[in-house]
């Protein structure tokens, strides 16, 4: 082992010691003050892992267990980069159920607003007293504003129109740049000696405005705890679509009951604070409710955001979706609507819905905006 110590720097040895744990300290090396603080912070959180306890490993090594939650929050904000902080805070709430991370006012105000923290707040807001809830609302507002700014741009771009390569535009927008026409128009500016083509007259395409008048859009959102990312993005997406002319947007949340949140769709913060995560699911009743909202089936879309694990009757769900499709309603089932579009869903139920005419996919919000722009044609 002395040969290994000769090959590795002290910092590298300390990194291996942090990875391997306290048992490796005598073999590798001790920790300096900074590394020991890192070890304390990591041990405070991950020392409570059930698998470690089953193996007989003690938790909270080297004094880490003596940290209070506020002290732990302060320490990780000093010791780690932002990406690691968000992961640690998320694991504390969602993996280990350390609820005072988001129910303690001092701790909550110290935490960095992020989507991970937003998820944690939505899972635990029912435990918060009014003062903590007010602080949580400010966090929700900040994170939602950041998501809204990003998604609103994607929605506007999707509905701005398709490029018309036959018509020239004199408005210089990068996304409308016509590469081939620009080459043809500037061939006379080719310099053989320099081996370069100088662009003096760039060309741009115009766009054909998409028509989306008099469409009705119903978003049915599963409130299962596993769907929290999709709930967040559905709320923000609905607010973005609400601002578009010619689209009437409804947002309905469901578990075993159905709650129409359309009155709050323009305010995604208020909407998210009303969502109740967890519980069972009765998807069929949500689809039936959505179908009853429709006024002109041929000008309507129902988007069902769910993992398709039906707590009620799967055959009744299939029947309700079939009735929607047969009436002329476009039905899109989304197993995930978030930034990664990584689904986990009941494939048998999803296939049954495909068999009666629904489309099933997992999409990012930008992909959903593009899908809607293509399908909402008058």
From Swiss-Prot:
InterPro entries listed in its UniProt record: LolB, Uncharacterised_CoxE, VWF_A, vWFA_dom_sf
GO biological process, one term: bacterial-type flagellum-dependent swarming motility
Protein name: Uncharacterized protein YehP
Source organism (scientific name): Escherichia coli (strain K12)
Designated gene of the protein: yehP
């Amino acid at each position: 082992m002395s040969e290994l110590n000769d090959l590795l720097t002290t910092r590298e040895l300390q990194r291996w010691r942090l990875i391997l744990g306290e048992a490796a300290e005598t073999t590798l090396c001790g920790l300096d003050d900074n590394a020991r603080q890192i070890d304390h912070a990591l041990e405070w959180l991950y020392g409570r892992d059930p698998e470690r306890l089953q193996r007989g490993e003690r938790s909270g090594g080297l004094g880490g267990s003596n940290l209070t939650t506020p002290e732990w929050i302060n320490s990780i904000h000093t010791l780690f980069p932002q990406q690691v902080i968000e992961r640690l805070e998320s694991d504390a709430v969602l993996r280990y159920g350390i609820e005072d991370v988001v129910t303690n006012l001092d701790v909550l105000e110290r935490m960095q607003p992020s989507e991970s923290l937003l998820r944690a707040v939505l899972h635990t807001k029912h435990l918060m007293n009014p003062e903590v809830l007010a602080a949580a609302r400010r966090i929700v507002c900040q994170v939602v504003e950041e998501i809204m700014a990003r998604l609103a741009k994607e929605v506007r771009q999707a509905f701005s129109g398709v490029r018309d390569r036959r018509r020239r535009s004199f408005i210089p927008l990068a996304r409308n740049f016509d590469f081939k026409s620009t080459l043809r128009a500037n061939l006379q500016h080719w310099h053989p000696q320099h081996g370069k083509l100088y662009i003096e007259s760039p060309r741009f395409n115009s766009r054909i405005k998409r028509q989306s008048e008099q469409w009705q859009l119903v978003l049915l959102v599963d409130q299962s705890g596993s769907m929290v990312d999709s709930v967040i993005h559905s709320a923000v997406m609905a607010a973005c679509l609400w601002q578009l002319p010619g689209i009437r947007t409804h947002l309905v949340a469901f578990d075993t009951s159905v709650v129409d949140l359309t009155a709050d769709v323009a305010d995604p913060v208020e909407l998210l604070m009303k969502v109740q995560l967890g519980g069972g699911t009765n998807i069929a009743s949500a689809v039936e409710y959505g179908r009853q909202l429709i006024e002109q089936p041929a000008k309507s879309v129902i988007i069902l955001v769910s993992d398709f694990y039906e707590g009620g009757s799967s055959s009744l769900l299939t029947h309700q979706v079939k009735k929607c499709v047969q009436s002329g309603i476009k039905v899109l089932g989304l197993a995930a609507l978030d930034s990664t579009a990584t689904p986990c869903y009941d494939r048998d139920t999803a296939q049954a819905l495909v068999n009666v005419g629904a489309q099933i996919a997992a999409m990012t919000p930008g992909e959903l905006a593009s899908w809607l722009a293509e399908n909402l044609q008058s």
